[in-house]
């Protein structure tokens, strides 16, 4: 059976941090589904990339996915602003059940909402590192960091390393 990766997303995502890993996953034979507020709604990235939501967060069931991808940009901040906390709850399923969880740039911010960063080693773009540290994570400045089921990366320049490691994690 083909492994399926959930991608949680809102407007103003960092375009390449969605398109590059999504393409790498699909080229490696994995299925991806974009999850957002409203099914069939079109989301627009910071640089104009458009993507359609496949499944609404209200209908998405984390147990139906083999991994989670959280691209960066301003999307994670919008997701964290969900009044019902649905994206944090969705993400927490993956972190607490040792399901592969991939986050790049600002994406690791959503991991703060899981209350599951204490003692974890992760990375992210420089301006989110203080938040990650305050949540109990050991934050390092490396292109890609793997801590059990969580794979994090810093910026678009790290995408080759990030993509390689998320594919490796899913093939394990």
Curated annotation (Swiss-Prot):
Signal peptide: none annotated. It holds the Pfam family DJ-1_PfpI. InterPro entries: C56_PfpI-like, Class_I_gatase-like, DJ-1/PfpI. Residues 3-171 form the PfpI endopeptidase domain. It comes from the Bacteria. Belongs to the peptidase C56 family. This is Uncharacterized protein SSP1625.
């Amino acid at each position: 059976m083909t492994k399926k990766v959930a991608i949680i997303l809102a407007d103003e995502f960092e375009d390449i941090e969605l398109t590059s890993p999504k393409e790498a996953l699909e080229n490696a034979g994995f299925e991806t589904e974009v999850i957002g507020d409203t099914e069939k709604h079109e989301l627009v990235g910071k640089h104009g990339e458009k993507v359609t939501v496949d499944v609404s967060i209200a209908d998405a069931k984390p147990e139906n996915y083999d991994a989670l991808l959280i691209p960066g940009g301003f999307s994670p901040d919008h997701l964290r602003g969900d009044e019902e906390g649905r994206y944090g709850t969705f993400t927490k399923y993956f972190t607490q059940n040792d399901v592969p969880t991939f986050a790049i740039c600002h994406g690791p911010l959503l991991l703060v909402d899981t209350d599951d960063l204490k003692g974890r080693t992760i990375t992210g773009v420089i301006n989110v590192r203080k938040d990650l540290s305050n949540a109990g994570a050991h934050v390092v400045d490396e292109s890609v960091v793997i801590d059990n089921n969580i794979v994090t990366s810093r910026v678009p320049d790290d995408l080759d390393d990030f993509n390689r490691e998320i594919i490796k994690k899913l093939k394990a």
